[in-house]
C-alpha cells in the first residue's frame, strides 16, 4: 500500500476523497500546485465542474506536471476527473489531459435534477456485493481504445475503465461509505508497481 496519495484540490469534492483515504489509513496531500505532487505516490482527480477544472489546471500550470506524474504513478479520475483524464471530450471548452484512450460526453445523463443512485455489479472484485453508484450530472464513456479494460457497466455502457495505470469512473465512489473502489485503486496499482 502507498504511504501518500495526492488529491487534486482545485475544485470539486476533494474533501470527500480525502476522508475516504483517511478511512483506509492513507495519508493524503491536497494538491494545489505542481510542487505538491512531490512525495505523492498516486493522484485522485475528483468530480466537480470540468470547464472550471480546465481553467484552474491551466491557471495553476498543472497540465504538464500531471502528465509527467503519470509516467511513474497511477491516477484515478472520478466524474469530472474522468472527463479530464480522457483523450477526447465532446466540448471544446475542455482541455483533457489525454491519459486514457476514451471519448467522453459531458452531462450525458442530463442536468442536476436527473442525477441518480443505483446499485451496480462489481465483476472485477470476485464475490463482491453490488456497489452503490452515485451519478451527478455524470459523463458517459462513448468510445474506448483497444487497450482499455471495462471494469464496470451500467445498461451496457462503461462506467469504470482502466488503461495501464489510469482509472476513470463516471460516478462518485467517495459519496458513499463503501471504500472498495478506493481500496482497489490503492491495492491493485501499488501491488502491480511492486512487481515491476
What are these regions (language model features)?
Residues 1-59, 65-68, 179-183, 187-196:
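N-terminal beta1-alpha1 cap of cysteine-dependent amidohydrolase-like domains
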Residues 2, 40, 71-73, 94-95, ...:
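Short coil/turn connectors at secondary-structure junctions
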Residues 10, 78-80, 100, 137, ...:
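A secondary-structure boundary/capping signal
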Residues 18, 86-88, 146:
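Short, well-ordered secondary-structure micro-motifs
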Residues 50-121:
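Cysteine-nucleophile active-site neighborhood
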Residues 106-196:
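Amide-donor transfer/coupling interface in amidating biosynthetic enzymes
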Amino acid at each position: 500500500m502507498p504511504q501518500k496519495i495526492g488529491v487534486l484540490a482545485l475544485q470539486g469534492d476533494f474533501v470527500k476523497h480525502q476522508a475516504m483515504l483517511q478511512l483506509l489509513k492513507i495519508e493524503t496531500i491536497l494538491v494545489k500546485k505542481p510542487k505538491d505532487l512531490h512525495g505523492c505516490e498516486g493522484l485522485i482527480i475528483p468530480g466537480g465542474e470540468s470547464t472550471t477544472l480546465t481553467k484552474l489546471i491551466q491557471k495553476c500550470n498543472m497540465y504538464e506536471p500531471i502528465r509527467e506524474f503519470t509516467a511513474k504513478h497511477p491516477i484515478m479520475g472520478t466524474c469530472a476527473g474522468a472527463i479530464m483524464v480522457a483523450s477526447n471530450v465532446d466540448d471544446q471548452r475542455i482541455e483533457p489531459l489525454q491519459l486514457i484512450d476514451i471519448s467522453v460526453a459531458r452531462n450525458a445523463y442530463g442536468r442536476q435534477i436527473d442525477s441518480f443512485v443505483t446499485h451496480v455489479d462489481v465483476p472485477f472484485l470476485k464475490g463482491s456485493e453490488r456497489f452503490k453508484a452515485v451519478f451527478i450530472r455524470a459523463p458517459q464513456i462513448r468510445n474506448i481504445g483497444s487497450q482499455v479494460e471495462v471494469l464496470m457497466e451500467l445498461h451496457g455502457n462503461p462506467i469504470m475503465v482502466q488503461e495501464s495505470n489510469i482509472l476513470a469512473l463516471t460516478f462518485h465512489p467517495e459519496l458513499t461509505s463503501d471504500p472498495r473502489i478506493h481500496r482497489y485503486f490503492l491495492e491493485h496499482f501499488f501491488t502491480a508497481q511492486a512487481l515491476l
